[in-house]
Amino acid sequence: MDVTPVLLLILDGFGYRESADFNAILAARKPNWDALWRDYPHTLINASEKFVGLPSGQMGNSEVGHLNIGAGRLVYQDLSRVDVAIEDGSFFTNPSLSKAVALSKQNDSTLHIMGLLSPGGVHSHENHIFAMLEMAARAGLKKVYLHAFLDGRDTPPRSATQSLQLLQDKCTALKTGQIASIVGRFYAMDRDNRWERVQPAYELLTQGRTEFTATDALSALEQAYARGESDEFVKPTAIVSGSAENTMQDGDVVIFMNFRADRAREITRALTDEAFGGFNRAYVPKLASFVTLSSYGEDFHLPCAYTQDAIHNGFGEYISNLGLRQLRIAETEKYAHVTYFFSGGREQPYPGEDRILVPSPKVATYDLKPEMSAFEVTDKLEAAILSRQYHAIICNYANGDMVGHSGNMEAATQAIEALDICIGRMVNAMRSIGGEVIITADHGNAEQMLDRTTQQAHTAHTLNPVPFLYIGRKAQLTESGALRDLAPSLLTMMGLPQPAEMTGHSLIQFAGCNKPVLSAVEGRSALHQ
């Protein structure tokens, strides 16, 4: 089939904000991006709130973004679904959750509720944890322990005090529940196979083995702050109150309240996989049940409360069925997003789909290596483009998001400058084979590095729109759109009809000229490599 080869470059965390105040994207020297933005059609699209299936005021994130991009339609998110279920009361009769509570009551065993205690809404929401505690209280459970993973990444770096106080107040009001441990998400929610981080969290949950203890959660947090730790990096701390055993034991029931899969998978595997080999587990509790709020993937055979509706005829499936070749490429931190999430929750590649995983650098935080593995990704991507094997390539560059999360303005600026070099190489490679490019982002982050309200580093995502830059034929673009419009736009570029299941709209309208104009402007926008 004769189609125009296309490249979708997703610059993770590369939002649009006109103010230069602590804006790493505007601060960066980026001659390639500036030339492309000047010379090619561009617009801004929405990547948060209702435009990606999230509640009003809720920032977008990588999982949500890639689901919407790959599906080519609005995909309602687990956050919204659980919020609605709590509001209409159906949450409290959810079969998987009800069965777990009933099993704990029947066996007079302990119920452990664990998850990211945060109002961030990216991986979890504290209101869901409060509702689960209420459900346990309604059932008359008294042995209920809460294991709070702390955020500081999708929330201000030191903001967990309020969340812990709210949880403690909820326990007091319901007369059930006790906070058994706190730990930063750095340890409990790794997604890069950094098992040396996960192991301390695992040992905290199963043995209470930790360097730090406290008599209550707020005191534990104060001690962590005194050690210079922010919420994300709070070292595992056991809350010791009385003689009761508050770690996970044989016969106990666990409910994991994170709804986003990518950072829930590793700790779940450590707690549930008999063949686990990430580290030596000194003690493995024989849990009566382990329930997840949402599905963490096809390879986890665990009961879950809310399953994602199947997405049929997303971009990857559709072009595969047409016999076309595609490539997905990213470094480790975003690999799941261009594969599993982009494919609507499908683990396995489609026929004709290749995948390239480039390992992320082994550093404590990515501000220590702002370029991350972008140049290695670019080397492999450039070779793939020049091989002329692929009709469509989906690539994610992680830098804007992962370095943006550090709150380090200088490092984030360096990250964007590294990306600019990569952008130049990729656009030139696509030019050489007569291909076309969309450059966009899944959500904002690096364009806002300081929270002027709190005067703390801004480490979270934003509500800002993201760029849509089309590098190809003469065209007119729709003035605005959303992430769901990217797949239809790619199909327009490829000259393919849009399947009925895709309800997004192409942002590209060709202006009566099918001849590429890349070479015509090369003299005044030649890209730096």
Residue ranges and their predicted role:
Residues 1-513, 518, 527-529:
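Feature captures the catalytic ectodomains and active-site-proximal regions of enzymes
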